[in-house]
Amino acid sequence: MSYWQDKVAIVTGGSSGLGRAIAEAFTAAGARVVIASRHAETLEQTAAQLSQNGRQVTPVAADVTRQEDVERLFTRTIDEFGRLDALVNNAGRSMRRAVLETTPEDFQQLMELNLIGLVRTTRAAAPHLLANRGHLVNISSLAGKSAARWVGAYPATKFAVSAYTQQLRLELGPQGLHVLLVCPGPIARDEPRDDNSRELRGEQAPGVPASALKPGAGVRTKAIQPERLAAAILRACEKRKAELIVPPAARLLFALMQLSPRLADWIVRKTT
C-alpha cells in the first residue's frame, strides 16, 4: 500500500503549474486532495480533470491573503475528511523589477502573498498536522537562498520563507511535525500565471533587460519539469527530509556565498 493511501493533503496555488503537478502526484499515490486557488474557474477545471478514475480532488476557491478564506479552506477540509496529513504552501508569485524601482508598497504586496499568506495557512494547519505527525511543505526558491538581479521584492520574500521554515523545523520538529523547505530553480510551464503574466512580460519592468524576463530571471539552467519536482517532493516527505534543492548543484553556490560572497556575486552576475 502507498504511504499516501487515504491521507489528506491541501495544496495552495493548486490550480496550475507546480501546484497542479503536486496535487496530481498526491492523487496518483492514493491521497485525498484539496486544491486551493483564487482563480476559481481554472480551479474547477483542474479538479474535474484530476478527479478521474475514482480519485478525489476537492476544489476550494480561496485567497491566502484573506484570513476568512483561509479559515473557510481548513474548516471545509476538516469537516469533509476529519483530518489533515499534509499542507503544501505553493501559492505565490514572482516579479520583474529593478531593486531601486521596487517601492515599499511593492514589497508589502508581495510579502503579503508569498510570506504572510503562508504564515496564515501554516498556523491553521499546525494543530491538525501535529496530531498526525504530518508534513508541512513550503515552496521557496533558489532565490530564497541566493538573491538574483531584476526580480524586485521576490528574493526578500523567499528568504523570509526559508527562515520561517527553519524556525518551524527547529520548534515543531521535536513534536513530530515534518517540515520540508523546497528551493527549486525555474519551473517549466506552458503559460505564466494570470496574475503574474504582465509582470513577467516586462510591461511593468522598466529598465529590466530582456534576458531577465525569461523563467528564473534568465538564470542559465535547464527548466525543471513540474511533474518530476512533484514526485521528488513526495519522496522527500516520505523520507522526512529537511530540504530539497533542485538542481542539487546549487548547493555549491550557497556554500560559496558563506565563504566568499564577492566571488559568489560574480558567479551570479555571469550566470544570469
Where are these regions (language model features)?
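Conserved glycine-rich cofactor-binding loop
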Residues: 8, 13-16
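Substrate-binding pocket helix/loop in short-chain dehydrogenase/reductase
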Residues: 70, 98-99, 103-108
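SDR active-site lid
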Residues: 170, 174-248, 266
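Conserved glycine-rich Rossmann-like NAD(P)H-binding loop of the short-chain dehydrogenase/reductase
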Residues: 31-45
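Active-site loop immediately N-terminal to the catalytic Tyr-X3-Lys motif
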Residues: 100, 146-152
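Active-site helix of classical SDR
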Residues: 122, 157
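Residue(s) in the substrate-gating loop at a strand-loop-helix junction
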Residues: 141
